[in-house]
Amino acid sequence: MKKKHKRLLVASGIFFFLNCIVFFILTILRENISFFYTVSEAITLSNNQKPIRIGGMVVEDSVIRSESEVVFQMTDFNKSIVIKYQGILPPMFSEKSGVVVQGKMFDGNTFLAETVFAKHDENYMPRK
């Protein structure tokens, strides 16, 4: 085999190997990327039973606390959705603040949240 053919074969092998590595990295990242849908997008996915994340703002005067759960409305300023959550809310959770909820759609306008994340900007300062 000529030197030129060997170099071409080695270069092709390296190129193939690097493409395989990039493919596997992208496949793994696709499963772990944390994105969220807007409320309007989530309502169109109401038939979906897979866990999703929805991001939006908590509607003012919509938070209803009971012994077993918290119910509130979340909006993207276009549409609103009812969120039901059983658990302890994050300390930064408040009305008219940004939240991301993770869970499943119950019906067209109700979302059963398993986790609630309070969103904050880059100037976050924990409460003392």
Curated annotation (Swiss-Prot):
It comes from the Bacteria. Residues 29-128 are extracellular. Residues 1-7 are cytoplasmic. One of its GO terms (molecular function) is metal ion binding. GO terms for cellular component: plasma membrane. Pfam families: CcmE. Heme binds at residues 120, 124. Belongs to the CcmE/CycJ family. Heme chaperone required for the biogenesis of c-type cytochromes. Transiently binds heme delivered by CcmC and transfers the heme to apo-cytochromes in a process facilitated by CcmF and CcmH. HAMAP family: CcmE. This is Cytochrome c-type biogenesis protein CcmE. It comes from Wolbachia sp. subsp. Brugia malayi (strain TRS). The lineage of its organism: Bacteria, Pseudomonadati, Pseudomonadota, Alphaproteobacteria, Rickettsiales.
